[in-house]
């Protein structure tokens, strides 16, 4: 059964805050608002990460609908937060919450434009149905040091950096090996009763061998052992193989995050 979208969105925002606190780069500014004119928005600011793509730009506002205390005048206050740090592009990640049409209207009124190049679905898996996937690759849980040593083999440095930098209690790292060669990476984060599947990447030369489906299966198994009652993962519609792998493993779409972009 798919959980309530608004409740899940609020929990995912807490999870994001916690993950960020464990892998925070030195340039990242984090601000959690509680009530007031910015509701319960969570804001991250990083002048060094102003890429044109929402997934790699760390200048973000995480917002769940029209939160209590917010109004149209909240949006200029958001903009000022970024301008003060000399950030010229940021994204609002709008997840389900109260009065969504009102929230959309506030953002559009102040010049934010919805990014429709792709969608950002959040998928979840409930229940305890086992999932197995056979591959000729070897899947192993590994240390952070082994992840760091393997990162150069994967060709998708940003994703492997994300996996490597999140560490400590609650994080589990996995590699797929072809003999002694690491060819794919993935991580699991356990937060409250959520098992969050994150930071997956496969070397270009070893795609279509089932590495990620096998890594999904291994993380489902580990999350069950940790007592998680729900598994969650996030992807992009344009990464069709990622979305398809999650659906095959029993994940269902819970909601889509709407991405709004602001440029100075």
Where are these regions (language model features)?
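Short amphipathic alpha-helix that is part of the acyltransferase structural core
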Residues: 1-21, 118-164
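Active-site rim helix/loop that mediates acceptor-substrate recognition in acyltransferases
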Residues: 16-30, 101-103, 153-177
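Conserved beta-hairpin
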Residues: 31-38, 102-113, 170-184
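A conserved beta-turn-beta hairpin within the catalytic core of GNAT-like acetyltransferases
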Residues: 46-61, 190-198, 207, 255
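Acyl-donor-binding surface of acyltransferase catalytic domains
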Residues: 69-143, 233, 238-239, 257-263
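Conserved acetyl-CoA-binding loop-helix of GNAT-fold acetyltransferases
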Residues: 70-80, 202, 208-225, 248
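A conserved beta-strand-loop-helix scaffold within acyl/acetyltransferase catalytic domains
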Residues: 157-205
């Amino acid at each position: 059964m798919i959980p309530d979208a608004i409740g899940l969105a609020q929990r995912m925002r807490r999870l994001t805050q916690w993950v960020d606190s464990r892998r925070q780069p030195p340039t990242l500014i984090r601000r959690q608002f509680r009530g007031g004119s910015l509701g319960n928005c969570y804001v991250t600011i990083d002048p060094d990460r102003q890429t044109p793509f929402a997934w790699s730009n760390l200048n973000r506002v995480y917002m769940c609908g029209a939160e209590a205390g917010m109004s149209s005048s909240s949006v200029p206050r958001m903009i000022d937060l970024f301008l003060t740090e000399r950030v010229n592009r940021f994204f609002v990640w709008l997840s389900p919450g109260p009065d969504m049409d009102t929230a959309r209207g506030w953002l559009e009124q102040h010049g934010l434009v919805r990014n429709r190049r792709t969608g950002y679905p959040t998928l979840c898996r409930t229940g305890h149905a086992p999932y197995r996937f056979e591959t000729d690759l070897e899947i192993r849980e590994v240390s952070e040091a082994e992840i760091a040593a393997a990162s150069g083999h994967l060709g998708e440095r940003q994703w492997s950096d994300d996996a490597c930098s999140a560490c400590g209690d609650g994080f589990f790292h996995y590699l797929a090996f072809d003999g002694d060669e690491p060819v794919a990476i993935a991580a699991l984060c356990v937060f409250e009763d959520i098992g969050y599947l994150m930071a997956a990447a496969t070397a270009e030369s070893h795609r279509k061998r089932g590495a990620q489906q096998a890594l999904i299966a291994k993380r489902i198994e580990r999350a069950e052992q940790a007592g998680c009652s729900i598994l969650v993962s996030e992807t992009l519609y344009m990464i069709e193989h990622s979305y398809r792998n999650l659906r095959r493993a029993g994940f269902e779409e819970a909601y889509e995050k709407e991405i709004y972009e602001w440029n100075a």
